[in-house]
C-alpha cells in the first residue's frame, strides 16, 4: 500500500467518512511497508487493500461483514468473501454463500466467485481486518485495522439513508451496537463457514430478507444476480 493521501486512495465520499482515521490509515500503510521490509508478505495486493472503499459511499444500502481476507495466496481481492474470477475451487464459505443464494433467490449458481457486481450495486463487502499474512489466518488482527473499519461502519450508520447490515457469525454480531444510530436494520445468522453453516446459515434467506427490509424503508432493492 503506497504512502498517498486518503483522497487518492478511496472514493470521495469515503475519504470524508474516513477522515477521522486518516492518520490510522497512514499508520497501517507504514505497518505494511515494514512487513515487506522484514521479508513478510501480506494479502491482498497493496492496490486492493482499500478496494471496498473505492465504490461510492452514498450508494451503500447493504453491508456484509467478513473477518479478515482469505489467507490462501491468490484468493484475497479486497472485498469480503469475493475471489478473482479464475479461482477454483471456491473457498468453502463462498460456496456455502452461493448455495444459500440459489436456495433463497432461485438463481443458478454463479459462473465464478467474483462479487464485484454486488459492490457496484450498493453492497459494501467489508472485512473488519483488511490484510493478512499468507497462510496465516487472523495474523493482522489487533494491528490497527479495526479502528478504520469501525469508523467506516459508524459513518454508514450515521447517515439518514437506509442500511441493512448482514452479520454472519459471532464476530460480526459484535458490531450491532454500532448500527443503532440512523436508519439501520441488522440481519443476523451463523457464519457460512463449514463449521457453522448447518447451524442456521442455510435457510436464513439473507438476500431476499435484505431486499424486503430495504423496500420497507423506501429504498431500492439490491439486484443480487451474478453472471
Curated annotation (Swiss-Prot):
Q: Which UniProt keywords apply?
A: Cytoplasm, DNA damage, DNA repair, Hydrolase
Q: GO cellular component terms?
A: cytoplasm
Give me the reactions it catalyses: Hydrolyzes single-stranded DNA or mismatched double-stranded DNA and polynucleotides, releasing free uracil
**Which PANTHER family does the UniProt record give?**
URACIL-DNA GLYCOSYLASE
Report the function annotation for this chain.
Excises uracil residues from the DNA which can arise as a result of misincorporation of dUMP residues by DNA polymerase or due to deamination of cytosine.
Q: What NCBIfam families does this protein's entry cite?
A: PRK05254.1-1, PRK05254.1-5, ung
Domain of life here? Bacteria
| Molecular function terms, GO-annotated | uracil DNA N-glycosylase activity
The alphabetized list of GO BP terms reads: base-excision repair; base-excision repair, AP site formation via deaminated base removal
For this chain, the family text in UniProt reads: Belongs to the uracil-DNA glycosylase (UDG) superfamily. UNG family.
What is the recorded name of this protein? Uracil-DNA glycosylase
Q: Where in the cell is it found?
A: Cytoplasm
Catalytic site residues?
Answer: 68 (proton acceptor)
Which Gene3D superfamilies does the protein's record reference? Uracil-DNA glycosylase-like domain
Q: Which organism is it from?
A: Mycobacterium tuberculosis (strain ATCC 25618 / H37Rv)
Q: Which SUPFAM superfamilies match?
A: Uracil-DNA glycosylase-like
**Is Cytoplasm included in the keywords of this UniProt record?**
yes
One protein family per Pfam = UDG
The record's EC number reads 3.2.2.27
Amino acid at each position: 500500500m503506497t504512502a498517498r493521501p486518503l483522497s487518492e486512495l478511496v472514493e470521495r465520499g469515503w475519504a470524508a467518512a474516513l477522515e477521522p482515521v486518516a492518520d490510522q490509515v497512514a499508520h497501517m500503510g507504514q505497518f505494511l511497508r515494514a512487513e515487506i521490509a522484514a521479508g513478510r508478505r501480506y494479502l491482498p495486493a497493496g492496490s486492493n487493500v482499500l478496494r471496498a472503499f473505492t465504490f461510492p459511499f452514498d450508494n451503500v444500502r447493504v453491508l456484509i461483514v467478513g473477518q479478515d481476507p482469505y489467507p490462501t495466496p491468490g484468493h484475497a481481492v479486497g472485498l469480503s468473501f469475493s475471489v478473482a474470477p479464475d479461482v477454483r475451487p471456491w473457498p468453502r464459505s463462498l460456496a456455502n454463500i452461493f448455495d444459500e443464494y440459489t436456495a433463497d433467490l432461485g438463481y443458478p449458481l454463479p459462473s465464478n466467485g467474483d462479487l464485484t457486481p454486488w459492490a457496484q450495486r450498493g453492497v459494501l463487502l467489508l472485512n473488519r481486518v483488511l490484510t493478512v499474512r499468507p497462510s496465516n489466518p487472523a495474523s493482522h488482527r489487533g494491528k490497527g485495522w479495526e479502528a478504520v473499519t469501525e469508523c467506516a461502519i459508524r459513518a454508514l450508520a450515521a447517515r439518514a439513508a437506509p442500511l441493512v447490515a448482514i452479520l454472519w457469525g459471532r464476530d460480526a454480531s459484535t458490531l450491532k451496537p454500532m448500527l443503532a444510530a440512523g436508519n439501520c436494520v441488522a440481519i443476523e445468522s451463523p457464519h457460512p463457514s463449514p463449521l457453522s453453516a448447518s447451524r442456521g446459515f442455510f435457510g436464513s434467506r439473507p438476500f431476499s430478507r435484505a431486499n424486503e427490509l430495504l423496500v420497507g424503508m423506501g429504498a431500492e432493492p439490491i439486484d443480487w444476480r451474478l453472471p
